[in-house]
Amino acid sequence: MAGQQAPTDKEAIKTTMWERMADSPYLMVGLTGAGQHQHSEPLTAQLDKDQVDTIFFFAGKDNRAAGGGEAMAQFVSKGHDFFACLAGTLAQDNDPAMIDKLWNKQVEAWFPGGKSDPNLALLRFDIDSAELWETDISLSGRLKMLFGGTIKAAESGSHAKVQTTAESTPA
């Protein structure tokens, strides 16, 4: 079927998303609900392999995203060859055990009071749906770019619309 991928392709692209995000965990995140500020801002993802379809962010309680609500996050990999648009819900989840689990030196640099900093908020982004693109232009596609020509879809990479970013789904 044109424009649709086999399940194995979707599984591969979801796995690639989490690998690329672990390598470069920076996303643009913004609230999308009515009356919300419509601009996204950069946040550093804290990934927990035990949480499916969830990304955590440390932010100040005074951060405009800290109020939570419907949100979108955009991701571009370090090599600019993988892209993700994630839709979901952002909410504060100040679970001390999760803060301990995700805490690191980079986060500590932003919060002088450490894990008990009064301005510290752990934001939980629960992903409801995602659209993922991986650009892996084939050799023939690269030659067409260099010398002119039309790149066919099969030469340009992978694309998937998914309801879960879990790396595998039960049969």
Task: Name these PLM-found stretches.
Residues 2-5, 120-171:
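C-terminal edge-of-domain segments
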Residues 16, 35-42, 65:
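Positively charged, polar, low-complexity stretches
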Residues 51-55:
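Short active-site oxyanion
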Residues 1-26, 164-171:
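N-terminal leader/targeting segments and the immediate start of mature chains
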Residues 19-36, 71-75:
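A short, Trp-centered hydrophobic/proline-enriched beta-strand micro-motif
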Residues 58-60:
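Short His-Asn-centered micro-motif
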Residues 64-128:
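Short, structured beta-strand-loop surface elements
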Residues 44-47:
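A short, well-structured catalytic beta-strand-centered motif of the EAL phosphodiesterase domain
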